[in-house]
């Protein structure tokens, strides 16, 4: 079975999916298994979404982090990466040319000129054993 879920809540998506596709301004910017994405996020927008997932270890009424700036104007296609104006890692190249959406390692695709550093990152508590594969659920 396949389910298409559209959400800004990657924590919720992780509880239902084996694989996550992250989109920004109508374009796919990162795609990987839940475990790979949460453990080794590469796209700054994906990282921002993960940072906004509510967590039980935060004090009550703590505001969630927000992505600075405004969403892009979808009526005018950007020459470069549409996330560049809001991205903390952006450089001139990002505004000038759109990065290719490529598979940078088996099963992990992303489109970013200046991705977050590669390397293991702890999977968020409570997400290590979620999703249909972990629970034996049907696809």
Where are the predicted features?
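Charged, flexible cofactor/metal-binding loops and thiol motifs
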Residues: 33-134
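Short, glycine/charged-rich "phosphate-handling" switch motifs in NTP-dependent
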Residues: 19, 31
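Switch/coupling loops of ABC transporter nucleotide-binding domains
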Residues: 1
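A short, surface-exposed alpha-helical micro-motif characterized by mixed small hydrophobic
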Residues: 13-15
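Catalytic metal- and UDP-sugar-binding loop of GT-A-like glycosyltransferases, i.e.
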Residues: 23
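H-loop/switch region of ABC-family ATPase nucleotide-binding domains
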Residues: 7-8
């Amino acid at each position: 079975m396949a389910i298409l879920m559209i959400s800004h809540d990657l924590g919720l998506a992780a509880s239902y999916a084996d694989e996550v596709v992250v989109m920004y301004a109508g374009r796919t910017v990162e795609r990987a298994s839940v475990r790979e994405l949460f453990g080794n996020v590469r796209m700054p927008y994906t990282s921002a979404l993960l940072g906004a997932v509510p967590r039980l270890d935060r004090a009550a009424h703590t505001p969630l982090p927000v992505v600075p700036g405004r969403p892009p104007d979808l009526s005018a296609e950007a020459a470069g990466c549409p996330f560049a104006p809001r991205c903390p890692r952006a450089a001139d190249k990002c505004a000038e040319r759109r990065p290719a959406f490529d598979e940078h390692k088996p099963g992990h695709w992303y489109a970013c000129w200046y991705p977050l550093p590669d390397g293991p990152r702890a999977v968020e508590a409570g997400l290590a054993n979620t999703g249909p594969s972990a629970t034996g659920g049907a696809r």
